[in-house]
UniProtKB/Swiss-Prot annotation:
Its main location: endoplasmic reticulum. Binds 1 [2Fe-2S] cluster. Regulator of autophagy that contributes to antagonize becn1-mediated cellular autophagy at the endoplasmic reticulum. Participates in the interaction of bcl2 with becn1 and is required for bcl2-mediated depression of endoplasmic reticulum Ca(2+) stores during autophagy. It comes from Danio rerio. The gene is cisd2. This is CDGSH iron-sulfur domain-containing protein 2. [2Fe-2S] cluster binds at residues 99, 101, 110, 114. SMART domains: ZnF_CDGSH.
Length: 135
């Protein structure tokens, strides 16, 4: 039953559909087609576009999955976790900026290396700013 239906579609209905399509003789003939003729061509053009895409898809470049990159590339890599302790009472200057991007040459103090890091990666990391409270 199913094979008979498929056979009827392929042998009878598909050729009849293709014969009724308003395919022009020349490329310039496409410019003279009316809106209703274009609408009759849409299913065929859609199927041809889908088949074309499925044919070239294996050759298209694959999108690489973005994986998280390491933040700390070189500072105290021998330690499993880098922790710096600073007593707030020991602040001598009114403001101190500490690095959070791990790119600072003066780590743990920020040297504004995060600006270049943010431009390159689109990240939004910034320093930790400690302010001495004035009474």
């Amino acid at each position: 039953m199913v094979l008979e239906s498929i056979s009827k579609i392929i042998k009878i209905q598909l050729p009849a559909y293709l014969k009724k399509l308003p395919l022009p003789e020349t490329i310039g003939g496409f410019a003279r087609l009316t809106v209703s003729e274009w609408l009759r061509l849409l299913p065929l053009l859609g199927i041809l576009a889908l088949l074309g895409y499925l044919t070239i898809r294996p050759f298209l470049p694959k999108k690489k999955k973005q994986r998280d990159s390491l933040i700390n590339l070189k500072i105290q890599k021998e330690n499993p976790k880098v922790v710096n302790e600073i007593d707030i009472e020991d602040l001598r200057t009114p403001n101190v900026c500490y690095c959070r991007c791990w790119r600072s040459k003066t780590f743990p103090v920020c040297d504004k290396s995060h600006i270049k890091h943010n431009e390159l990666t689109g990240d939004n990391v910034g320093p930790l700013i400690l302010k001495k409270k004035t009474l």
